[in-house]
Amino acid sequence: MDAAQRLRLHLAIGKAADDLGDYALAMQHFDAADWVRRSSTPFDPAAFAIETDSLIASCTPELMACAPQLGSSDATPVLIIGMPRSGTTLLQQIVSSHPEVGAGGELNFWNDRGAVWHSSGAAGIEKPFQAKAAADYLRVLRAIAPRAARVTDKMPFNFLWAGLIHLAFPRATLIHCRRNAVDTALSIHQTQFHPTLAFPTGGAELVAYFRSYRRLTDHWRKVLPADRFIEVEYEDLTRTPEPVIRRIIAACGLEWNDACLRPERNPGAVKTPSKWQTRQPIYRNSVARWRRYEPWLGPLRSLVEDGREKSPT
Protein backbone atom coordinates (compact mmCIF):
# COMPACT_ATOMS: atom_id res chain seq x y z
CA MET A 1 0.00 0.00 0.00
CA ASP A 2 1.51 3.32 -1.06
CA ALA A 3 1.42 6.59 0.91
CA ALA A 4 -1.64 7.96 -0.89
CA GLN A 5 -3.61 4.79 -0.16
CA ARG A 6 -2.55 4.81 3.50
CA LEU A 7 -3.60 8.44 3.77
CA ARG A 8 -7.05 7.77 2.33
CA LEU A 9 -7.49 4.69 4.50
CA HIS A 10 -6.65 6.50 7.75
CA LEU A 11 -8.94 9.42 6.87
CA ALA A 12 -11.79 7.06 5.96
CA ILE A 13 -11.47 5.10 9.21
CA GLY A 14 -11.22 8.35 11.15
CA LYS A 15 -14.38 9.68 9.50
CA ALA A 16 -16.26 6.44 10.24
CA ALA A 17 -15.13 6.52 13.88
CA ASP A 18 -16.18 10.18 14.15
CA ASP A 19 -19.63 9.31 12.77
CA LEU A 20 -19.92 6.59 15.43
CA GLY A 21 -18.82 8.92 18.23
CA ASP A 22 -15.55 7.08 18.92
CA TYR A 23 -13.43 10.22 19.02
CA ALA A 24 -10.35 8.57 20.52
CA LEU A 25 -10.15 6.09 17.64
CA ALA A 26 -10.96 8.83 15.14
CA MET A 27 -8.12 11.03 16.37
CA GLN A 28 -5.73 8.09 16.30
CA HIS A 29 -6.36 7.69 12.57
CA PHE A 30 -6.41 11.41 11.80
CA ASP A 31 -3.02 11.69 13.52
CA ALA A 32 -1.75 8.75 11.46
CA ALA A 33 -2.96 10.42 8.26
CA ASP A 34 -1.16 13.60 9.25
CA TRP A 35 2.06 11.66 9.78
CA VAL A 36 1.77 10.21 6.25
CA ARG A 37 1.20 13.69 4.80
CA ARG A 38 4.14 15.22 6.66
CA SER A 39 6.43 12.47 5.39
CA SER A 40 5.61 13.28 1.75
CA THR A 41 5.02 17.07 1.82
CA PRO A 42 7.16 18.65 4.57
CA PHE A 43 6.44 22.19 5.75
CA ASP A 44 8.93 24.65 7.25
CA PRO A 45 7.14 26.86 9.82
CA ALA A 46 10.26 28.96 10.46
CA ALA A 47 10.55 29.86 6.77
CA PHE A 48 6.85 30.74 6.67
CA ALA A 49 7.26 32.99 9.71
CA ILE A 50 10.16 34.80 7.97
CA GLU A 51 8.02 35.25 4.83
CA THR A 52 5.24 36.65 7.01
CA ASP A 53 7.64 39.11 8.67
CA SER A 54 8.85 40.25 5.26
CA LEU A 55 5.32 40.83 3.95
CA ILE A 56 4.42 42.85 7.03
CA ALA A 57 7.57 44.97 6.71
CA SER A 58 7.02 45.57 2.98
CA CYS A 59 3.31 46.40 3.06
CA THR A 60 3.43 49.64 5.01
CA PRO A 61 0.47 51.98 5.55
CA GLU A 62 2.21 54.46 3.24
CA LEU A 63 2.44 51.90 0.43
CA MET A 64 -1.18 50.81 0.84
CA ALA A 65 -2.25 54.46 0.66
CA CYS A 66 -0.76 54.55 -2.87
CA ALA A 67 -3.31 52.03 -4.16
CA PRO A 68 -5.65 54.55 -5.87
CA GLN A 69 -2.71 55.83 -7.93
CA LEU A 70 -1.32 52.37 -8.75
CA GLY A 71 -4.39 50.20 -9.28
CA SER A 72 -7.46 49.63 -11.41
CA SER A 73 -10.73 51.39 -10.64
CA ASP A 74 -12.66 48.19 -11.40
CA ALA A 75 -14.72 46.82 -8.50
CA THR A 76 -15.49 43.40 -10.00
CA PRO A 77 -13.32 41.19 -7.74
CA VAL A 78 -14.67 39.82 -4.47
CA LEU A 79 -11.89 37.86 -2.78
CA ILE A 80 -12.86 35.54 0.06
CA ILE A 81 -9.81 34.76 2.17
CA GLY A 82 -8.93 32.98 5.40
CA MET A 83 -7.69 29.63 6.60
CA PRO A 84 -8.89 26.53 4.77
CA ARG A 85 -12.01 25.09 6.44
CA SER A 86 -12.92 28.48 7.93
CA GLY A 87 -16.17 28.93 5.98
CA THR A 88 -14.87 30.39 2.72
CA THR A 89 -16.92 28.01 0.57
CA LEU A 90 -20.12 28.86 2.44
CA LEU A 91 -19.38 32.55 1.99
CA GLN A 92 -18.90 32.10 -1.74
CA GLN A 93 -22.20 30.21 -1.97
CA ILE A 94 -23.94 33.06 -0.13
CA VAL A 95 -22.43 35.89 -2.16
CA SER A 96 -22.77 34.12 -5.51
CA SER A 97 -26.45 33.42 -4.80
CA HIS A 98 -26.92 37.08 -5.70
CA PRO A 99 -28.05 37.32 -9.36
CA GLU A 100 -25.33 39.87 -10.16
CA VAL A 101 -22.46 37.74 -8.85
CA GLY A 102 -20.51 34.96 -10.56
CA ALA A 103 -18.68 32.24 -8.63
CA GLY A 104 -15.02 31.93 -9.59
CA GLY A 105 -14.06 29.15 -7.20
CA GLU A 106 -10.44 28.86 -6.06
CA LEU A 107 -8.29 30.64 -8.63
CA ASN A 108 -4.54 30.01 -8.72
CA PHE A 109 -3.73 33.52 -9.89
CA TRP A 110 -2.27 35.64 -7.10
CA ASN A 111 0.17 33.12 -5.69
CA ASP A 112 2.47 33.23 -8.73
CA ARG A 113 2.17 37.01 -9.10
CA GLY A 114 2.61 37.46 -5.38
CA ALA A 115 5.83 35.50 -5.34
CA VAL A 116 7.25 37.62 -8.18
CA TRP A 117 6.03 40.85 -6.59
CA HIS A 118 7.44 39.99 -3.19
CA SER A 119 10.82 38.86 -4.47
CA SER A 120 11.20 41.93 -6.71
CA GLY A 121 11.11 44.34 -3.77
CA ALA A 122 10.61 47.99 -4.72
CA ALA A 123 10.32 47.13 -8.42
CA GLY A 124 7.16 45.22 -7.66
CA ILE A 125 5.27 48.34 -6.64
CA GLU A 126 5.70 50.07 -9.97
CA LYS A 127 2.43 50.90 -11.70
CA PRO A 128 3.05 48.74 -14.83
CA PHE A 129 3.27 45.62 -12.65
CA GLN A 130 -0.04 46.39 -10.93
CA ALA A 131 -1.70 47.35 -14.22
CA LYS A 132 -0.72 44.11 -15.95
CA ALA A 133 -1.76 42.00 -12.96
CA ALA A 134 -5.12 43.77 -12.84
CA ALA A 135 -5.73 43.40 -16.59
CA ASP A 136 -4.79 39.71 -16.56
CA TYR A 137 -7.00 39.01 -13.55
CA LEU A 138 -9.98 40.79 -15.06
CA ARG A 139 -9.62 38.66 -18.20
CA VAL A 140 -9.80 35.55 -16.01
CA LEU A 141 -12.88 36.81 -14.16
CA ARG A 142 -14.65 37.89 -17.36
CA ALA A 143 -14.06 34.48 -18.90
CA ILE A 144 -15.84 32.94 -15.90
CA ALA A 145 -18.81 35.32 -15.72
CA PRO A 146 -18.87 37.81 -18.63
CA ARG A 147 -21.98 39.71 -17.50
CA ALA A 148 -21.57 39.62 -13.72
CA ALA A 149 -21.11 42.84 -11.75
CA ARG A 150 -18.98 40.96 -9.22
CA VAL A 151 -17.03 37.69 -9.43
CA THR A 152 -15.77 35.79 -6.40
CA ASP A 153 -12.37 34.18 -5.89
CA LYS A 154 -12.37 31.98 -2.80
CA MET A 155 -8.74 30.88 -2.81
CA PRO A 156 -8.17 31.00 0.97
CA PHE A 157 -4.40 31.44 0.69
CA ASN A 158 -4.90 34.83 -0.94
CA PHE A 159 -4.66 36.12 2.63
CA LEU A 160 -0.93 36.18 1.88
CA TRP A 161 -1.38 38.64 -0.97
CA ALA A 162 -4.09 40.96 0.34
CA GLY A 163 -1.68 43.89 0.11
CA LEU A 164 -0.80 43.21 -3.53
CA ILE A 165 -4.47 42.66 -4.39
CA HIS A 166 -5.41 45.98 -2.81
CA LEU A 167 -2.68 47.75 -4.77
CA ALA A 168 -3.96 46.22 -8.01
CA PHE A 169 -7.67 46.68 -7.17
CA PRO A 170 -8.23 49.35 -4.51
CA ARG A 171 -12.01 49.00 -5.01
CA ALA A 172 -12.07 45.20 -4.74
CA THR A 173 -13.80 43.68 -1.73
CA LEU A 174 -11.69 41.41 0.48
CA ILE A 175 -13.81 39.29 2.83
CA HIS A 176 -11.80 37.65 5.60
CA CYS A 177 -13.60 34.63 7.04
CA ARG A 178 -12.60 33.98 10.66
CA ARG A 179 -13.53 30.85 12.57
CA ASN A 180 -12.54 29.50 15.96
CA ALA A 181 -8.95 28.35 15.49
CA VAL A 182 -9.35 24.96 17.16
CA ASP A 183 -12.46 24.10 15.15
CA THR A 184 -10.64 25.16 11.99
CA ALA A 185 -7.49 23.24 12.86
CA LEU A 186 -9.45 20.10 13.73
CA SER A 187 -11.32 20.29 10.42
CA ILE A 188 -8.02 20.72 8.55
CA HIS A 189 -6.64 17.72 10.45
CA GLN A 190 -9.58 15.61 9.26
CA THR A 191 -9.58 16.67 5.59
CA GLN A 192 -7.86 15.30 2.51
CA PHE A 193 -6.15 18.09 0.58
CA HIS A 194 -4.42 17.93 -2.78
CA PRO A 195 -1.24 15.86 -2.31
CA THR A 196 1.02 18.57 -3.75
CA LEU A 197 -0.18 21.24 -1.31
CA ALA A 198 2.70 22.09 1.04
CA PHE A 199 0.45 23.00 3.94
CA PRO A 200 0.55 21.67 7.52
CA THR A 201 -2.42 19.59 8.62
CA GLY A 202 -1.65 18.97 12.27
CA GLY A 203 0.61 19.24 15.27
CA ALA A 204 2.93 22.08 16.20
CA GLU A 205 3.45 22.94 12.52
CA LEU A 206 -0.22 23.82 12.08
CA VAL A 207 -0.18 25.87 15.30
CA ALA A 208 2.84 27.82 14.01
CA TYR A 209 1.13 28.38 10.66
CA PHE A 210 -1.97 29.71 12.43
CA ARG A 211 0.05 32.19 14.43
CA SER A 212 1.80 33.53 11.33
CA TYR A 213 -1.54 33.74 9.53
CA ARG A 214 -3.05 35.72 12.40
CA ARG A 215 -0.09 38.10 12.55
CA LEU A 216 -0.48 38.81 8.85
CA THR A 217 -4.25 39.27 8.90
CA ASP A 218 -3.90 41.49 11.97
CA HIS A 219 -1.57 43.62 9.83
CA TRP A 220 -4.05 43.80 6.94
CA ARG A 221 -6.71 44.96 9.38
CA LYS A 222 -4.46 47.86 10.36
CA VAL A 223 -3.26 48.99 6.93
CA LEU A 224 -6.19 48.31 4.58
CA PRO A 225 -9.35 50.45 4.44
CA ALA A 226 -12.07 49.09 6.70
CA ASP A 227 -14.63 49.28 3.90
CA ARG A 228 -12.44 47.11 1.62
CA PHE A 229 -11.19 44.56 4.17
CA ILE A 230 -14.36 43.05 5.65
CA GLU A 231 -14.17 40.50 8.46
CA VAL A 232 -16.85 37.89 9.06
CA GLU A 233 -16.99 35.60 12.08
CA TYR A 234 -18.17 32.13 11.07
CA GLU A 235 -19.91 31.69 14.41
CA ASP A 236 -21.86 34.94 13.94
CA LEU A 237 -22.75 33.97 10.37
CA THR A 238 -24.25 30.66 11.48
CA ARG A 239 -25.96 32.08 14.59
CA THR A 240 -27.62 35.15 13.03
CA PRO A 241 -27.21 34.81 9.25
CA GLU A 242 -29.36 37.64 7.92
CA PRO A 243 -27.68 40.70 9.50
CA VAL A 244 -24.23 39.32 8.70
CA ILE A 245 -25.16 38.52 5.10
CA ARG A 246 -26.77 41.93 4.62
CA ARG A 247 -23.52 43.55 5.77
CA ILE A 248 -21.50 41.43 3.32
CA ILE A 249 -23.75 42.20 0.35
CA ALA A 250 -23.70 45.92 1.15
CA ALA A 251 -19.89 45.85 1.40
CA CYS A 252 -19.80 44.38 -2.11
CA GLY A 253 -21.74 47.40 -3.36
CA LEU A 254 -24.82 45.38 -4.29
CA GLU A 255 -28.52 45.80 -3.66
CA TRP A 256 -30.06 43.30 -1.30
CA ASN A 257 -31.51 40.05 -2.73
CA ASP A 258 -33.31 37.43 -0.63
CA ALA A 259 -31.64 34.61 -2.59
CA CYS A 260 -28.53 35.23 -0.49
CA LEU A 261 -30.35 33.76 2.52
CA ARG A 262 -30.75 30.39 0.72
CA PRO A 263 -27.25 29.47 -0.44
CA GLU A 264 -28.16 25.77 -0.54
CA ARG A 265 -30.30 26.56 -3.59
CA ASN A 266 -27.35 28.01 -5.48
CA PRO A 267 -26.65 25.65 -8.42
CA GLY A 268 -23.02 26.76 -8.82
CA ALA A 269 -20.39 24.03 -8.80
CA VAL A 270 -18.32 23.52 -5.65
CA LYS A 271 -15.07 21.58 -6.11
CA THR A 272 -13.65 21.64 -2.58
CA PRO A 273 -13.95 19.33 0.45
CA SER A 274 -16.88 21.50 1.61
CA LYS A 275 -19.12 20.46 -1.32
CA TRP A 276 -21.60 18.45 0.75
CA GLN A 277 -22.04 21.13 3.40
CA THR A 278 -22.91 23.81 0.84
CA ARG A 279 -25.95 21.80 -0.24
CA GLN A 280 -27.41 22.16 3.25
CA PRO A 281 -29.14 25.19 4.80
CA ILE A 282 -26.88 27.31 7.03
CA TYR A 283 -26.38 25.33 10.24
CA ARG A 284 -24.34 25.40 13.47
CA ASN A 285 -23.32 21.74 13.69
CA SER A 286 -19.67 22.63 13.06
CA VAL A 287 -19.43 25.17 15.90
CA ALA A 288 -17.41 23.98 18.93
CA ARG A 289 -16.80 20.50 17.45
CA TRP A 290 -13.35 20.61 19.03
CA ARG A 291 -14.84 19.96 22.48
CA ARG A 292 -15.58 16.36 21.49
CA TYR A 293 -11.86 15.91 20.87
CA GLU A 294 -10.56 17.92 23.81
CA PRO A 295 -8.68 15.05 25.53
CA TRP A 296 -6.78 14.24 22.30
CA LEU A 297 -5.99 17.69 20.89
CA GLY A 298 -2.27 17.50 21.62
CA PRO A 299 -0.40 20.57 20.32
CA LEU A 300 -3.65 22.06 18.98
CA ARG A 301 -4.67 22.72 22.58
CA SER A 302 -2.30 25.70 22.62
CA LEU A 303 -4.66 27.47 20.20
CA VAL A 304 -7.15 27.55 23.08
CA GLU A 305 -4.58 28.34 25.74
CA ASP A 306 -2.56 31.05 23.98
CA GLY A 307 -4.80 33.83 25.33
CA ARG A 308 -6.05 35.01 21.94
CA GLU A 309 -8.61 32.37 21.07
CA LYS A 310 -12.17 32.62 22.29
CA SER A 311 -13.65 29.24 23.13
CA PRO A 312 -17.05 29.08 21.42
CA THR A 313 -20.06 27.79 23.28
Regions found by a protein language model. Name each.
Residues 2, 6-7, 152-153, 313:
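Short coil/turn segments at secondary-structure boundaries
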Residues 1-144:
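Alpha-helical solenoid repeat scaffolds of the TPR/TPR-like class and their adjacent stem/linker regions
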Residues 101-104, 109-126, 130, 144-309:
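PAPS-dependent sulfotransferase catalytic domain
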Residues 45-49, 260-264, 311-313:
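Short, flexible loop/turn segments with low-complexity composition
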